[in-house]
Each structure stands twice: as structure tokens, then as C-alpha cells.
From Swiss-Prot:
Disulphide bridges, residue numbers: none
Gene: hflD
Organism of derivation: Methylococcus capsulatus (strain ATCC 33009 / NCIMB 11132 / Bath)
Transmembrane feature ranges: none
Entry protein name: High frequency lysogenization protein HflD homolog
Electron transport in keyword set: no
Lineage top rank: taxon: Bacteria
Keyword field: Cell inner membrane, Cell membrane, Cytoplasm, Membrane
Lineage: Bacteria, Pseudomonadati, Pseudomonadota, Gammaproteobacteria, Methylococcales
Membrane topology recorded in Swiss-Prot or TrEMBL: Peripheral membrane protein
Family, per entry: Belongs to the HflD family.
Localisation: Cytoplasm; Cell inner membrane
A Pfam family it matches: DUF489
Main localisation: cytoplasm
Length: 207
């Protein structure tokens, strides 16, 4: 992937959208289906032509761009919980890259679930369950774990739990993409203004 600021911002928007949806499901028991499909399908978009295509187009991650715009508004992100989810996934991605066995399990598993998704033609409960299982067998083996806050009734519901884990896996996918596009943690501190400007430009272009 081309290492440009706009590509990094698109990938970060994917991460922001995934973590936002995790919280919505954890707290409300539901989330926007279109927003969810865009980021979850990114897990399967290994051979996309460009970064926007990973999510099906910039317009599919408008929610993530809006959240990213708000999070970059000041030196400290206004939404500490979403920032914590994102920071934990960024840390876990580094650890995953350093664990070849888990990484290979993840790659093989994604290919298998991708075939299932193509067979069903949709992201049904079986696809979400298999993505959740893959997350548990790979990313969940690393520390720290992503501690999701929410209503116990939603968190203990198996359908919701599967969707949350699938979205966390999608978040990892966005972090991998961000790294491939030249993303570095220091840029989150020192390029905030430039990234926010780019997020707003992308939002306007997706109208």
C-alpha cells in the first residue's frame, strides 16, 4: 500500500469505526448494520487495489472519519474509552506480528472464513461466530486483552459477543493496514492537526 497521509487516515477511520461499533453493541446491544459490514468485510480484503477499496469506498467509513475528526481535535482525545480500545489494538498488532504461529493461524483462518462468507453471500451469524472464534484463538492469546465495558446482558449474549470479537478483529485489520501505509504511534502525537485536516477533506469528498 502507498504510504501517504490520506491512506493512514482512512485506515485509522476504519479502526475508529470498529471500536465505536464495539461500544455500541456492548452498551446498546445493536449497531448500524452498514457500518459494521464495511469494517468486518475489510478482514477479507487482503488483495484490494487501494486503501479505500478495503472498506468498499471512503463513504462506507464516514462514521469512523467523524469520530477520528473529534478524537484529533485536541492534544488529549475527548473520548478516552475509544482511545483506550484503539491504543490496545495497536499494541496487540505489534505483538501479533511478533508471534509467527498465531499470525499463520490467523491468515489461514481468515481464508477459510472468507470462503464461508462468499458461499453464504452475507455476513450471517455463522460467519461472525467463526471470526469470533478466530479472534479468541489468536489475538486473545496475547496480552493485554481488550477490556470492553458495557451492559452485562449485552456482553453475555452470544450473538453480541461474537460481533464484538469480529469487530475487534476488524480493528486489528485496520491497524495492520495503517502500519502498511506508514502509520507510526509518534505520528498520532505530532501529526494530529494534519491528520484531522485530511479526515475533514475525506469527509467532504465522500458527501
Amino acid at each position: 500500500m502507498i504510504k501517504t497521509l490520506d491512506n493512514q487516515v482512512i485506515a485509522l477511520a476504519g479502526l475508529a469505526q470498529a471500536t465505536h461499533l464495539v461500544r455500541q453493541i456492548a452498551q446498546r446491544g445493536s449497531a448500524d448494520a452498514g457500518d459494521m459490514e464495511a469494517v468486518v468485510r475489510s478482514v477479507f480484503a487482503i488483495d484490494a487495489d487501494d486503501v479505500p477499496s478495503v472498506y468498499g469506498g471512503v463513504d462506507k467509513i464516514k462514521t469512523g472519519l467523524q469520530i477520528l475528526d473529534r478524537q484529533l481535535a485536541g492534544f488529549e482525545p475527548p473520548d478516552a474509552e475509544l482511545a483506550r480500545y484503539g491504543a490496545t489494538l495497536i499494541l496487540l498488532e505489534r505483538k501479533l506480528v511478533s508471534a509467527p504461529r498465531l499470525l499463520e493461524t490467523l491468515r489461514t483462518g481468515i481464508e477459510q472464513v472468507k470462503e464461508q462468507a462468499e458461499y453464504f453471500g452475507e455476513l450471517n451469524d455463522t460467519v461472525y461466530a467463526n471470526l469470533a472464534d478466530l479472534y479468541q484463538r489468536t489475538v486473545s492469546q496475547l496480552r493485554p486483552r481488550v477490556m470492553v465495558n458495557g451492559q452485562p446482558s449485552h456482553l453475555t449474549n452470544s450473538t453480541n459477543a461474537n460481533r464484538i470479537r469480529a469487530l475487534l478483529l476488524a480493528g486489528i485489520r485496520s491497524v495492520v493496514l495503517w502500519r502498511q501505509c506508514g502509520g507510526e504511534r509518534w505520528k498520532l502525537l505530532f501529526q494530529r492537526s494534519a491528520m484531522r485536516k485530511e479526515a475533514r477533506r475525506l469527509l467532504q469528498s465522500s458527501q
